[in-house]
Amino acid sequence: MSSTSTSNTAGITYPKAYDVVVIGGGHAGTEAALAAARMGAQTLLLTHNIETLGQMSCNPAIGGIGKSHLVREIDALGGAMALATDKAGIQFRVLNSRKGAAVRATRAQADRILYKAAIRHTLENQPNLDLFQQGADDILVENGKACAVVTATGIIFRTKTVVLTSGTFLGGVIHIGLDNSKGGRAGDQPSIKLAERLRELKLPVGRLKTGTPARIDARTVDFSVMQTQPGDTPLPVMSFMGNVDMHPEQVNCFITHTNEKTHDIIRKHLDRSPLFSGTIEGVGPRYCPSIEDKIHRFADKNSHQIFIEPEGLTTHELYPNGISTSLPFDVQLEFIRTMAGLENAHITRPGYAIEYDYFNPQNLKPTLETKSIDSLYFAGQINGTTGYEEAGVQGLLAGVNAALSTQDNPVMDSWTPRRDQAYLGVLVDDLITHGTKEPYRMFTSRAEYRLLLREDNADQRLTEIGRKLGLVDDTRWQAYQQKMESMATESARLKDLWATPHNELGKKFTEQTGEVLSKEATAYDLLKRPNVGFNDIAAVTGAQVAADVGEQIEISVKYAGYIDRQQEDIDQMKRLENTQLPADFDYKAVSGLSNEIVQKLNDIRPATLAQASRISGVTPAAIQLLGMTLKKQKKAKAALDI
């Protein structure tokens, strides 16, 4: 990869120079392009096919455990995913609704066509953003810095920064049984030349694998023998700016199960599986395994739940969630027809596995800029993640930092949230600190400060930052300010209302909740009781605030003690986060560090003491030594400056 690449550079140079060129129009690419353009950067989104912008390549769903938290963070920063989901969602459910607020998660089944249309509409109406249909074959580099992108026909787009969001297209190989073919996904050509160019970088390249199930014609399915899975009532929304009126028609999903016959057929044909024959070298997602992998790994289970999900309102295609497979087509047809309701199923598209290139994310800066090439940013599956939501949030961050690097921003020259600020911060820190050898998926369990990182308060955590960055428009900002003002006003009102065992408010409270007061308390403090919700307090005090405002007040009251304790831990960690480690820090010169620790620190080059403390094998004693060394260096420098 250099400025001396051969045939491609013989083409024309496009007359307009850009601040940011984004390669790839998937979930990472669209959020990257929109973020950069919202910040005022002249941005180009380069895609091999404009018709597939925002395409849901696998399951037609957004959100879920840990994932909806990321979607809400994208939304709080002005991104497109949540609003597109509200416009396309054909079933909404809140998962873990009976558990604590930290792990509750909204999941939406989406109409593929409506979702793609919503994303494309947003892209086409975004100022400062141009679209261009053509694949990228090369990234030109001068003096160690990305400076242009060359398309398949040799068109050169000059740019200050490049954001690469290639998904599964880099060196993509599709597997169905023992047959394989080159492809970025079914029906799309892979990016071969760009993959070859990228391998010239001094970055460790790996191979990962993902897969998708067969699609089924709903007209050949007997839903009467399946369990019906309806959406929630009242309907949830995904975006802070969304509302129920945006939602299209709502539909049911269904549940069936595999059985011993299903498993016997799959076991019988494992020798024809590329996963078990050794044809596939890439590691697949641990938390979304293929059906053949599930049956092999969980041999003691005689049944697995399969969710039958509609792909949209205007199509008969169904997505059978839980039977991703790369077995031959004849085996797919045979095992699918063993399940209740699918005995006569017609497959419209076979399932397949896809193997693709990714790059070790430990070679990225916290901004998602590569350490090897300046002004080149990676986002999405190229960094070893899996999932639309993980891709989208990385794309937004890469787009933000690419834009910032081209601007003289008085507020900040780069931005990456801390682990206590956002799941995005957790994701990036995990990737750049630990790397990954398998597709990385977000879970709430990955966040040590998850009481603070709830999906319901993503706007309180990030919208003000988004406003400073230029990501949040006036409409969203005004809505956020009104919400915060409403929360403050209502909280103050409740603190001024006193209930006693004998006054009218106290009697109403007991009648509403069945709880007897033994002493006086404010309406605000009554929310601390486990069995009392904001709706109860609203009923007896005449509160008239939006549902999300009431929810926020209730959560803040009930979790106040836990949050305060967690905040103490965060304050301690912030001291380490604020201690920068120079990029050229000489770890060998620190007396007392073991060779193993020196090697790990040299390999990862942590940006802060906090990041260093999270590297496996780096001890608290080592962190103390590093801190002492930095203090000595700071004192020595101060003495020289006198």
Curated annotation (Swiss-Prot):
- Spell out the GO cellular component terms annotated for this protein, sorted alphabetically and separated by semicolons: cytosol
The free-text function statement in the UniProt record for this protein reads: NAD-binding protein involved in the addition of a carboxymethylaminomethyl (cmnm) group at the wobble position (U34) of certain tRNAs, forming tRNA-cmnm(5)s(2)U34.
Q: Tell me the NCBIfam families matching this sequence.
A: mnmG_gidA
Residues annotated to bind FAD: G24, G25, G26, H27, A28, G29
| Description of how the protein assembles with itself and partners | Homodimer. Heterotetramer of two MnmE and two MnmG subunits.
Q: Which PROSITE patterns match?
A: GIDA_1
User: Which cofactors must be present for this protein to function?
Assistant: FAD
Protein name, as recorded: tRNA uridine 5-carboxymethylaminomethyl modification enzyme MnmG
Q: Which family does it belong to?
A: Belongs to the MnmG family.
> Which residues does NAD(+) bind?
284-298
Q: Which PANTHER family match?
A: GLUCOSE INHIBITED DIVISION PROTEIN A, PROTEIN MTO1 HOMOLOG, MITOCHONDRIAL
Gene Ontology biological-process entries: tRNA methylation; tRNA wobble uridine modification
Localization, per the record, is: Cytoplasm
* Gene Ontology molecular function, alphabetical: flavin adenine dinucleotide binding
From what organism does this protein derive? Psychrobacter sp. (strain PRwf-1)
Query: What UniProt keywords are attached to this protein's entry?
Result: Cytoplasm, FAD, Flavoprotein, NAD, tRNA processing
- Please give the SMART domains that the UniProt record associates with this protein: GIDA_assoc_3
